[in-house]
Amino acid sequence: MSTGQLKRFKGCEYLTHRLVLATLSGTPIRVEGIYPDEADPGVKDYQVSFLRLLEKLTNGSVIEISYTGTSFIYRPGNIIGGRVVHDCPTTKGIGYFLEPILILCLFAKTPTSLTLTGVTSSNEDIGVDVLRTSVLPSLQKRFQVGDELELRILKRGSAPGGGGEVNFLCPVIKESLPPIRLSEFGRVFRIRGIASSTRVSPAFANRLVESARGVLNPFIPDVFIYTDVRRGDECGNSPGYSITLVAETNKGCSYAAEHCGEAGETPEDVGSFCAKKLLEVIESGGCVDPYTQPSTLTGMLLSSEDVNTIVVGQLGITSQLVVFLRDVKALFNCEYRFKELESGQVEMSCLGKGYLNVNRRIQ
């Protein structure tokens, strides 16, 4: 159960990560000023849904939402994990709910089997393909948790109807996370990707592949993009298509980019836009891309009591990062040190807290 004094926050930017940090630290929080000036003020359906998901993953959590919905109190309980099924609203992608809790489930009482339903690919939120092909392999390598950390895409669901389904499997860790030291990002030596479609012609996926390769092949010959065409019971009711690209370096780093087709966009537009987006991320440099950065920074915070260091590109320095660092300072009393390098990248370092899994079952 949560202990300590109630911490107050204003605004709901990066709310999901704030709630996860509060759960890990066991600190009760009060969040105020949630969309107070909008025509429809107060917490949105997807924010309430994330609170309910945390309630399912924990035991003893208490959530109190004000009458107007512009503020709420969250008192975190113990992280228990286990088998959980959650239906995500179609206003947000599944990645909005899954990405923040990747670290949380490592510190549960029992291994987690989480089934989420909803929209699998969205331009507003991280897609499940990026999580499966870029973020999770990075966490497996740096946190030494092995292949038990897995994400299965059972059904694909495009916006606005959703209907997708994924299953996330996560083990529990017995010791502190190892320190993270990433200073060299190396050179890109290959690019892999997935072009997916739901309830449209299979030719759409092939057109995505050809347009992306047309942009990337002049820079690197080793480009291979898989196609995943879903129809019938393998997907939701909405037609759609998307592409995810992951560039791997000879130092074990990866950069990802994704894009979903919207109204008026052809598969050629989507494929070439995503490829150019990937080139921008590669040019920015750093050892982690913006998708992997939140989980990596949280892992640095929770790692054994040693110095952690990573290098991030300019694309990783955002307003959301500032909010995250303020929340870390408020909830863990920990600070990150910044050092700008001659190359234009930024070196971030912090001292790990030596966080232990006090929830796990003693065997």
From Swiss-Prot:
The lineage of its organism: Eukaryota, Fungi, Dikarya, Ascomycota, Taphrinomycotina. Pfam families: RTC, RTC_insert. It comes from Schizosaccharomyces pombe (strain 972 / ATCC 24843). The keyword Cell membrane does not apply. GO terms for cellular component: nucleolus. The keyword Flavoprotein does not apply. This is rRNA processing protein rcl1. Does not have cyclase activity. Plays a role in 40S-ribosomal-subunit biogenesis in the early pre-rRNA processing steps at sites A0, A1 and A2 that are required for proper maturation of the 18S RNA. Rcl1 activates bms1 by promoting GDP/GTP exchange. It comes from the Eukaryota. InterPro entries: RNA3'-term_phos_cycl_insert (IPR013791), RNA3'_phos_cyclase_dom (IPR023797), RNA3'_phos_cyclase_dom_sf (IPR037136), RNA3'_term_phos_cyc (IPR000228), RNA3'_term_phos_cyc_type_2 (IPR016443), RNA3'_term_phos_cycl-like_CS (IPR020719), RNA3'P_cycl/enolpyr_Trfase_a/b (IPR013792), RPTC_insert (IPR036553). Keywords: Nucleus, Ribosome biogenesis. Interacts directly with bms1 and the U3 snoRNA to form a stable subcomplex. Component of the 90S small subunit processome also known as 90S pre-ribosome that consists of the 35S pre-rRNA, early-associating ribosomal proteins most of which are part of the small ribosomal subunit, the U3 snoRNA and associated proteins. It is found in: Nucleus, Nucleolus. Belongs to the RNA 3'-terminal cyclase family. Type 2 subfamily. One of its GO terms (molecular function) is RNA endonuclease activity. SUPFAM superfamilies: EPT/RTPC-like. One of its GO terms (biological process) is endonucleolytic cleavage of tricistronic rRNA transcript (SSU-rRNA, 5.8S rRNA, LSU-rRNA). CDD domains: RNA_Cyclase.
